[in-house]
Structure formats: structure tokens, C-alpha cells
Amino acid sequence: MNELENYHGRLFTKYQLTSEEREKAKTVSSVVGKNSCFRCGTSFEEENKLPNAAYYCRACLLLGRVRTDEKLYYFPQKDFSMNACLLWKGTLTDWQQRISDGLVANVEKRQATLVHAVTGAGKTEMMYHAVASLINKGGAVCLASPRIDVCIELYKRLQNDFSVPISLLHGKSDPYFRTPLVVATTHQLLKFYQAFDLVLIDEVDAFPYADNPILYRAADNAVKVDGVLVFLTATSTDELDKKVKSGKLQKLSLPRRFHGNPLVVPQKVWFSKFDTYLKKNKLVPKLRNAIQKQRETGYPLLIFVPEISKGLEFATIMEQNFPEETIGFVSSQTDNRLEIVEGFRNKEITILISTTILERGVTFPGVDVIVVQANHYLYTSSSLVQISGRVGRSMDRPTGLLLFFHEGSTRSIEKAIAEIKQMNKEAGYV
């Protein structure tokens, strides 16, 4: 294999390459616009001035230092061999087919697109034909998402549904190898340059992507000059809505789930003194009763808490109150998060307590959801819509329990409920 095989479509700083490799590479200025970093688009700051009067970019420093007095290096992407790559033999609903056809047509026309589809609509399958249409011709495609958990789940599904090699890229993944299909966290896009014929960004409204100019820049750099960007979301953002209005993005909407049933609408439940009870190692009686009643059904229970510290305390109290249950807790700081999530999916864990880390991109068949302190400022309307979307996703149980325990309703709660009802209305449910 050519020693530079895995360099094609990648962007490098000077000292990430040997002098021999630099001679074989093409170069691009490290400065774009008036005074911004080519790689991430951030302005060079006076405080990041070097002794020789050059500047460096602090925003993307972890990927190698970009300096104004040094070029950036890249190796142009090469075509892959043509391949009939789609193994998936499933069928789409009429609603899904409409979106799939629209995507294929827009990719053909190189029309940037926003797919606004409700949670549980089957977005992944709707992308397949557009993805395959390019890989079949020797093209390269990247599916990116802000969350590692989402990327890993997507990677597993794609391995079953496509015959080509696939690489998975995130902060803790194996080194990159060049493949026609790449699954990556959105930050990893900063390492590519004109590499992909199609970049699909899933869960585009999620932290840290939501309206983050660095990651929009990364997506623009990663796609080829004649390539196309597609954004997928269940809850749009102000920036994306602006792009739709200005004609930069064409919007394709799907307000209906794949199984044809309406979205589950959250029920608000008022309660008080959650923090006070927590300090006394107790559960608010109203919350305890609701959990007790839910456990009688035997369905798995996912409980969201707004903060890690509260989640840890809450998990301990839950174990004391429900000793017969197997209880897990996950947050962004949980090292074995993936194993715990898998344990919940396999029903080894019966109650899973989580921060917003599991608000999106994961499916647990038949799950019920309780949001504790839904009024907390960390719960945006977008995250509450996503959390609600965990319920009723499976054909076997398209309904479920969805409770927002709050200490006074908020604009985010009301907006989330209104949005869910509006989607049901658009789908023809009264």
C-alpha cells in the first residue's frame, strides 16, 4: 500500500509531516479572510502572538498548532473503486420514501439540505440511498454527529447495512484509515480537507455543534468543492432556519414516525422540594409513587436528572428505595458509559438514571421516561423534545409513559410540548 494512502483528504500542520512528506503535499495558506484560522475560522488574537510576530490559533490547538507564518498541507482525495455497497433490504414507508427520493435528487443536484424529521422517524434508513448513490460511483461519504454515543451506534448499524470498509473516528478511537464511508464526531471534521462528496451531520442541534461557527467551518472544509452538505435534526436551530429562509438550504420535513403512530406528548407533574429531600437522602413522595407505579408494568425506566452531582445522589437514594431493581447511572464523566447503556438495553439494568448525555441518538425499545426537575435551566426546549423522543419508538410499543416532573413550568417545557403537538398535527393526527 502507498505509504501516503491514509493522508488523502486530510489537512496537516507543518510538523505533523516529515520534510519528505511535505514535498509531496499541496499547501494552503493558514490564514483565511482578514485574519482568521483556515482550519477552524477563529480570529487570531493579539494575546496569541509569538516572539517572531506571527500568531497561532488557540481554538484548534489540540489538533496541532496553526501559525500565520506557516502553510497548511493537504493531499488531494482520490476516488475509491466503484462498489454496489448497500446490503440493507428493508422497505421505507411512503413518508420516508419521499424524503429519501428528495435527498437522492438533492445530492445529484449538489443542493445543500436540511432534513427536519421527528424523533423515531427512521432518519438513518432515509439516508441510505443517497449515501449508496455516491459510494457506488467511487465517492466518499462522511456521517458526523456531535456525540460519541451516537457515532458508535451509527457505526454498528452501517457495518450491517453496507459492504464497504467503514472507519470510526472520535477522541478515543483507533487511528484513521482511508475508507469510502466514515463515521466521525463533528470535531474530527477539522482534520479533513475537500475529502467528501457528501457530509451528513446528524443531530445538528446537539452540543457542541449547535450553531458553533468552528464546526460549521469544519463541515465546509471537509466537503469537496462540488460536494454537498446535509443536516439532519428533529429540532432545528435559529442558524439553520435562517439558512432555509435565505435559500442556502432546502428543507425536507417528516412529521411522522416510521410506525405511523403519533409522538407521545409529555404529561406535566408538579412537585416541590426535590433538592431538600435529596439532602435528607429521601425521594419526594409524589415522585416515589410514580416510579413505584411504573415498576409494576415491568417496562424499562429511563430517568433524566439535570446535573451530575444530583444524579449520583439520586442513584444512591433510588438503590435504597428500590433494592429489588438493578440501577445504573451515566453522565459525560462515566468511564464505562457504553457498557452501562448496553446493560440497560439488554435488560440487565432495569432503571437507568442519566444526565442529558442520553437525550438523543439512542433507542431503548419499550422504555418509559421520567424527567426530574424538567424546569431546570439546563433543559432547553430542544433537549426536552429529544428526551421525549426516547418514548414510543418501537413498533411493538409505540406508546409509553412520559412524565415531566417540574417545580413550576418554564418556557422550554411549554415550547417542547407545543412543538410535539404541532408535529402530530402536521402528520395528520388531531
Predicted regions and their residues:
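Conserved segment of the helicase C-terminal RecA-like domain
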Residues: V225-E239, S388-E419
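Post-DEXD/H (motif II) to motif III coupling segment of the RecA-like Helicase ATP-binding lobe
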Residues: F196-W270
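Conserved RecA-like helicase motor core of SF1/SF2 enzymes
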Residues: E203-A206, I340-V341, R345-P398, H406-R411
